[in-house]
Amino acid sequence: MRTGSMLRTISDSAIRDQAASTLSGKPRRWSWTAFFGPALIAAVAYIDPGNFATNIEAGSRYGYTLLWVVLAANLMAMLIQTLSARLGLATGQNLPQVIRARYPRPLVWCYWVQAEIVAIATDLAEFLGAALAFHLLFGLSLMEGALLTGTITYLALHLYRYGFRLMEILIGAMILAVAGGFILELVLSRPEPAPLLKGLLIPGFPDGYALYLAAGILGATVMPHVIYLHSALSQQRIQVKDDAHRLRLMRYYRLDVILGMAIAGLVNLSMLAMAAAVFHATGRLDVATISDSYLLLAPVVGQVTASHVFGLALLLAGLSSSIVGTLSGQVIMQGFVNVSIPLWLRRLVTMLPALAVIMLGISEQKALVASQVILSFGIPFALVPLLCFTANRQIMGNLVNRKSVTGVGTVVCTLIVALNVYVLFSTFTGH
């Protein structure tokens, strides 16, 4: 009986009722929690295995110096995800649907193809990260880890048929576990407070490679597929009755984004600071792979718990981000070309590149780098339309961006695109 009562309180209809009562000025106890969830799902993409690789290398090579980059990237992510939620709420459509309605059909098909490629490349990194975690923690082969990852993520995706709230609870539990794990890692590593605060608050680049890593941190933080996804998730809570309700709902969504991105930011800051305290401080400046980090943590920190917690955090981050990647792929296909395929089929298709990488014996580190390069191509295609649409009063109505928000968004968008062009140029030229 208690189980049935609990399930009723977390059902989609119950969440919608709680949200409606709060927006109508008749909040129930804890009814404000009904608005929290979409940004937690989006936040998972900001702590995927690609972030592990860039944060660890930045911390081991430059200590705390690039902490400010992580903080700045997180603030940019807050703005971008807020705009995505705002677009979905104002239009009742996700970003791909708005693009489909307003762009020429040939261009829409090009958008769809690049978005699918970026989503698959992103899922490659997430999938390999989870498979690598199974290998490090339990001694499984990468192929066994990959097959286990595919099975677990498929079973988790099966929950979505029972409603969005169960999925939000599952993903939320995973991201909170990852955050708890890295807070523990930070405590075990005993960082120096003064250099940590200096790196967090004082911008600077020690050399040219630091700029390259900073661009990599930003590229691993801003994820096109969750920009598409978040605009879809913001429509699920409640059908708003009028403009006043819509504005009130947007305030809650803004808080949701702040909470979700703050958790993701805490994870990334803890990750880089841990690498700085454990590796840079002991002269290990060349730790650049996830495997090296796992193997060196226990000997340096002096506790085997450190390695196990790191491996478990990697596993949960890989699994949860792979789940979110599959959901994003559904939104991308449905939005751009108005076609849906079963989740199991999408899960199978997006597994194939990871399985091919493992069978061909390609280094997981090289695959992660390649996935980040492909990701860099897709960022402008999501950011530019998002900024243009949310600044258009005909599309957004009373949720249109203020001029100041559009101005800041333009600066952020230009900076992100420029840094990603720099990463691509540096990668292909070898500089």
UniProtKB/Swiss-Prot annotation:
Gene: mntH
Protein name as catalogued: Divalent metal cation transporter MntH
InterPro entries: NRAMP_fam (IPR001046)
Highest taxon of the lineage: Bacteria
Record-annotated membrane-spanning stretches: 30-50, 63-83, 106-126, 137-159, 169-189, 209-229, 257-277, 287-307, 309-329, 341-361, 367-387, 405-425
Any one GO CC term of the record: plasma membrane
Keyword field: Cell inner membrane, Cell membrane, Ion transport, Membrane, Symport, Transmembrane, Transmembrane helix, Transport
Known role: H(+)-stimulated, divalent metal cation uptake system.
Cellular compartments annotated: Cell inner membrane
UniProt GO MF annotations: cadmium ion transmembrane transporter activity; manganese ion transmembrane transporter activity; metal ion binding; symporter activity
Taxonomic lineage: Bacteria, Pseudomonadati, Pseudomonadota, Gammaproteobacteria, Oceanospirillales
Membrane topology: Multi-pass membrane protein
Listed GO biological process terms: iron ion transmembrane transport
Chief location category: membrane
Source organism of the structure: Chromohalobacter salexigens (strain ATCC BAA-138 / DSM 3043 / CIP 106854 / NCIMB 13768 / 1H11)
Family to which this protein belongs: Belongs to the NRAMP family.
